[in-house]
């Protein structure tokens, strides 16, 4: 992971993200879809997508770009690896299925 200097001033942290930060840091977020009811419009705006596109990414977390993962991590003031780990655990089955199809051809 890169060297991330998280902003420390209270004006650069949206209080709506405090619960999301706590949930990620405590390990209670195990799927990205768990964010669906936690400031979805605000997060969609942060990511520069509409609500429907954000909802689609929550259902298919492999569609989040590296930039979007890092942007969310900085906005939530967490290490981007935390989000990466959630996504990796969530998509491991899809990755294995795709690899199996590849080798069967």
Labelled PLM ranges:
Residues 47-64:
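Recognition helix of helix-turn-helix/homeodomain-like DNA-binding domains
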Residues 4, 67-82:
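DNA major-groove recognition helix of helix-turn-helix/homeodomain DNA-binding modules
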Residues 2-38:
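A short, Lys/Arg-rich alpha-helix, primarily the initiator
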Residues 77-97:
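Short C-terminal boundary/hinge segments that cap the last helix of small helical domains
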Residues 41, 52, 81:
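Key DNA-contact positions within bacterial/archaeal DNA-binding proteins
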Residues 2-3, 93-105:
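Short acidic DE-rich linear segments
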Residues 39-44, 72:
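Short alpha-helical "recognition helix" segments of helix-turn-helix
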């Amino acid at each position: 992971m890169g060297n991330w200097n998280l902003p420390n001033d209270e004006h650069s942290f949206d209080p709506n993200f405090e619960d999301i930060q706590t949930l990620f840091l405590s390990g209670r977020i195990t799927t990205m879809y768990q964010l669906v009811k936690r400031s979805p419009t605000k997060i969609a705006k942060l990511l520069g997508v509409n609500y429907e596109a954000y909802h689609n990414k929550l259902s298919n977390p492999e569609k989040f770009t590296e930039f979007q993962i890092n942007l969310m991590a900085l906005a939530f003031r967490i290490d981007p690896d935390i989000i990466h780990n959630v996504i990796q655990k969530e998509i491991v089955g899809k990755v294995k299925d795709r690899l199996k199809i590849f080798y069967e051809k």
